[in-house]
Amino acid sequence: VATRNMAMSRQKKLDKMEVIELAKEKPKPEFCFKEARAAGKVIFETDDLVIGYNKKPLSKPINLRMERGEKIAVTGTNGIGKTTFLKSVLGLIPAVSGKAVLGDYLYKGYFEQEIKPGNNTCIEEIWETFPSYTQYEVRSALAKCGLTTEHIESKVRVLSGGEQAKVRLCKLINVETNILLLDEPTNHLDIDAKDELKRALKEYKGAVLIVCHEPDFYEDLVDKVWNLEEYSLLA
């Protein structure tokens, strides 16, 4: 009876104790961009480039030039044409008029603002891009980008915006590049991931063209700022 009373007394004490949750696995990201050989002197140059969709212009003629190793932020209000400018430079959409001329020996890395994820798990997503990787290498690459085991084994579409961005950054950092074109890469990232991305971009020797609406992120990262409002037909 005494033993039973002691056990009940201990159980009451346990019931009163607050439940302490173990800290959830939260790996810190480590981004390190792989670098290709040096690009030619000129990365790209625009010649009276007018951007827009379906032949409807969004801008006045744009004449800009980017050189090897430069880091430039593209800014402006929403809807001004920042994404359109990036896609026009890359040749992914046609210019309304004028042109963008790309330089020599470019190894491009492009981070799109939004991509609709398919049905792949994170592992499958990376394996499709890097089929020669072992499963261990795929898992390690994803973990380095700050994803947990649970994330890594999940389908990309069920992840949060920040976690999906880390999967896409995982693809980007493991390809050799000498020019990065980044469209709002900080949009969904947590503070640790933002800080680490900024550190990695500062260390990167190639050119960086980044669309960003966060001055705190780009101000001490870039050499110059291109404000597309200066070229806007809406201004």
Task: Indicate residue ranges for each PLM-predicted region.
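Long, charge-dense, solvent-exposed interaction surfaces that engage phosphate-rich ligands
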Residues: R10-Q11
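ABC ATP-binding cassette signature C-motif
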Residues: P27, F33-A235
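Alpha-helix N-cap/helix-initiation sites
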Residues: R4-A7, Q135
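Short intracellular "coupling" helices and adjacent cytoplasmic loop segments at the cytosolic face
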Residues: V1-N5, E21
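Active-site phosphate-binding and catalytic loops of NTP-dependent enzymes
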Residues: L22-K26
